[in-house]
């Protein structure tokens, strides 16, 4: 299967996940990644750019080493995707509230020195971005149409609110990282599916 055909298959697989569905707001930072507005007034992201940026992020992560990456988010729906990502690749996860000084205060017991940070939402994960920037650590961020991305080194334009969309972004990242590492061929399926990355909601939470 050619790379173009494989890309087409991937696009078909992920279109229904809402990965390209943005919000009713667009910032000047995200304008280059937006293709149009839906009839409902939601700005739509360019899926080709998203896939290209995922490849860029995967190359960046592999160059610095998955073991030197921390993946963090205060967003609930990002927890399972991050856990699966880190379980598969061996990166470190930081979920929930990002404790001040984590990247900037060596005297704290939870201080760490990663070479790269991956965040799920520039607004929710602002503390992590600020500390990484102050410490000179590059940041990869998943950003929606309404996000400010001035302190991100690599922007992955995608829906960072939806459960399935977030699962898809992290699944795509794992897949591309494994391809870059030579552990998976472009045409081969992964043994983990998007559903494995998705945060599940219980009946109690729905009620």
Curated annotation (Swiss-Prot):
One GO cellular-component annotation of the UniProt record comes to: cytosolic small ribosomal subunit
Gene3D superfamilies xrefs:
Glucose-6-phosphate isomerase like protein, domain 1 (3.40.50.10490)
Q: Which PANTHER family match?
A: 40S RIBOSOMAL PROTEIN SA
- Supply the InterPro entries for this chain: Ribosomal_uS2, Ribosomal_uS2_arc, Ribosomal_uS2_CS, Ribosomal_uS2_euk/arc, Ribosomal_uS2_flav_dom_sf
Organism, as annotated: Nitrosopumilus maritimus (strain SCM1)
Biological processes per GO annotation: ribosomal small subunit assembly; translation
The taxonomy runs:
Archaea, Nitrososphaerota, Nitrososphaeria, Nitrosopumilales, Nitrosopumilaceae
Q: Which family does it belong to?
A: Belongs to the universal ribosomal protein uS2 family.
Single GO molecular-function term? structural constituent of ribosome
Q: What is this protein called?
A: Small ribosomal subunit protein uS2
Q: What keywords tag this UniProt record? A: Ribonucleoprotein, Ribosomal protein
Q: Which CDD domains match?
A: RPS2 (cd01425)
């Amino acid at each position: 299967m050619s790379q173009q055909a494989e890309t087409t298959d991937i696009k078909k697989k992920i279109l229904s996940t809402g990965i390209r569905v943005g919000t009713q707001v667009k910032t000047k930072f995200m304008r280059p990644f937006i293709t149009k507005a839906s009839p409902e007034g939601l700005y739509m992201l360019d899926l080709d750019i998203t896939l290209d940026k995922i490849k860029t992020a995967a190359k960046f992560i592999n160059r610095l080493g998955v073991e030197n990456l921390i993946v963090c988010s205060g967003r609930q729906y990002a927890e399972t995707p991050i856990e699966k990502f880190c379980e598969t690749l061996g990166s470190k996860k930081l979920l929930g509230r990002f404790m001040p000084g984590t990247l900037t205060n060596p005297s704290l017991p939870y201080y760490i020195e990663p070479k790269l940070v991956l965040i799920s939402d520039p607004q929710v994960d602002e503390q992590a971005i600020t500390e990484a920037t102050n410490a000179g650590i590059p940041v990869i961020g998943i950003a929606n149409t309404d996000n400010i991305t001035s302190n991100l080194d690599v922007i992955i334009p995608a829906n960072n609110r939806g459960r399935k969309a977030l699962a898809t972004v992290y699944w795509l990242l794992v897949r591309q990282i494994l391809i870059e590492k030579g552990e998976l061929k472009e045409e081969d399926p992964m043994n983990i599916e998007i559903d494995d990355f998705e945060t599940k909601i219980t009946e109690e939470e729905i009620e």
